[in-house]
Amino acid sequence: MRIALCIEYDGAEYYGWQRQRDVNSVQEELEKALTIVANEPIEVHCAGRTDAGVHGTGQVVHFDTTSSRKLAAWMMGANANLPKNIAVRWAKEVNEDFHARFTATARRYRYIIYNNRLRPAILGHGVSHYHDALDANLMHEAGQYLLGENDFTSFRAVHCQSRSPWRNLMHLKVTRHGDFIVIDIKANAFVHHMVRNITGSLIEVGKGKQKPEWIKWLLEAKDRKLAGATAKAEGLYLVDVDYPLEWELPRVPLGPLFLDND
């Protein structure tokens, strides 16, 4: 039996998604909880491996098991054994052709900036604080230069292990909600640190240091050293993963918190 789950987690206390020796990871905590419910060892496979400090509201995983449980039992049992900063949002039985990573057609992230001169006391690990005034409209204009299938070398981590820097960026929208700026970005896949590196460069535009056209120049330059600094991890959320409609996977609000699905 193969089960797919949607997972929400606060990544502030974890050294990323992937199980690693001697450090806390989201994968390890989820596998421990599911192992208790299944009464057998469980290994999960995820749609996207998030880095240390990065959060998820729409991470999708799958696992195989010989244990027969109702879907409600998988959800409630896992949540009863998970830390409070990790939760299962839905569960669905799928056939063996489904793979959380390889069946996915797109991933969607949101980066949340608290744009205020003073730092926040609440949500300190859930948003990235930037004190200088940012122009969200200019950031949105700049982001449109990245749409389509492009070589994202200028926005990929130096030690990225992906074989190709080419990705298809389908959607990028920057909006302001009071003191919060939201960068909403969707692509078929992402190279390492791609969202955070794009965010760092959009911030340069937002504070008036660079013009929107600079982003187009960066994309064409294919040189990471020319782009902005990598934005902090705490503002980043994996909010959704797309799959072919034939899988009929449940849908939940993207979030985080007050943000809608637009």
Curated annotation (Swiss-Prot):
Enzyme type, top EC level: isomerase
Oligomer and partners: Homodimer.
Molecular function terms, GO-annotated: RNA binding; tRNA pseudouridine(38-40) synthase activity
Keyword field contains Isomerase: yes
Family: Belongs to the tRNA pseudouridine synthase TruA family.
Stated name of the protein: tRNA pseudouridine synthase A
Lineage, top ranks: Bacteria, Pseudomonadati, Pseudomonadota, Gammaproteobacteria, Vibrionales
Annotated catalytic residues: D51
Catalytic activity, EC: 5.4.99.12
Residues that hold substrate according to the record: Y109
Highest taxon listed in the record's lineage: Bacteria
Pfam families per the UniProt record, alphabetical: PseudoU_synth_1 (PF01416)
Catalyzed chemical reaction(s): uridine(38/39/40) in tRNA = pseudouridine(38/39/40) in tRNA
Biological process annotations from GO: tRNA pseudouridine synthesis
InterPro entries to which the protein is assigned, alphabetical: PsdUridine_synth_cat_dom_sf, PsdUridine_synth_TruA, PsdUridine_synth_TruA_a/b_dom, PsdUridine_synth_TruA_C, TruA/RsuA/RluB/E/F_N
Keywords from the named record: Isomerase, tRNA processing
Chain's role: Formation of pseudouridine at positions 38, 39 and 40 in the anticodon stem and loop of transfer RNAs.
